[in-house]
Amino acid sequence: MRFDNPRFTTVYHRNAWGQWTFTFEGVKLCGLEFQGGANPGSPKACAYAEPEAEGKVRGRTAQIYHSAIRELNLYLNGKLKKFSIPIKIYGTEFQTKVLEATMKIPYGKTKTYKELAEIVGHPRAERSVGNTLHNNPLQIIIPCHRVVSSSKGIGGYTLGTDLKRKLLCMEGAVENELDLE
């Protein structure tokens, strides 16, 4: 979904991992995108950083924004297993079901595209599940990196398979990066 409507507030934040784009509708986060730019393996990858556009958010939205940054940094440092910030998911009924089911995959666990299709009641819709996850508007928060191919291989990932491997290793879903070739 495109968040170019005036009802959305977009704020850019940079940490040691790179550039992040947060999009809010009121006090709910509806978009989080990672543009990269830094080596995610860096020991300083989770350093807190001031947002580049602090003045764009005020009041309760500012509180949620700061909570989102804090939770994101804690997660990227391996110290947070589940996000608690309020979110809003946009999409068709099918897409919403897929994204909500993906949020229920526990930290350190994986599901296959096929298993997710079965969970949402469309057992033959593996490809549609993959397309929905490819367009995940809340990267990291909706943990589509926890969805792997039926052969238990890495599968695709919008942010790149190297990052997917790193996240799954950090979560302990695989013992090492070579387990997902």
In which residue ranges do the predicted regions lie?
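Short cysteine clusters
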Residues: 144
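…primarily DNA-binding HTH/wHTH and HhH modules…
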Residues: 150-181
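Major-groove DNA-recognition helix of helix-turn-helix-type DNA-binding domains
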Residues: 141
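Regulatory, non-catalytic segments
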Residues: 124-136
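Basic nucleic-acid-binding alpha-helical/helix-turn surface characteristic of O6-alkylguanine DNA
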Residues: 1-123, 170, 174-181
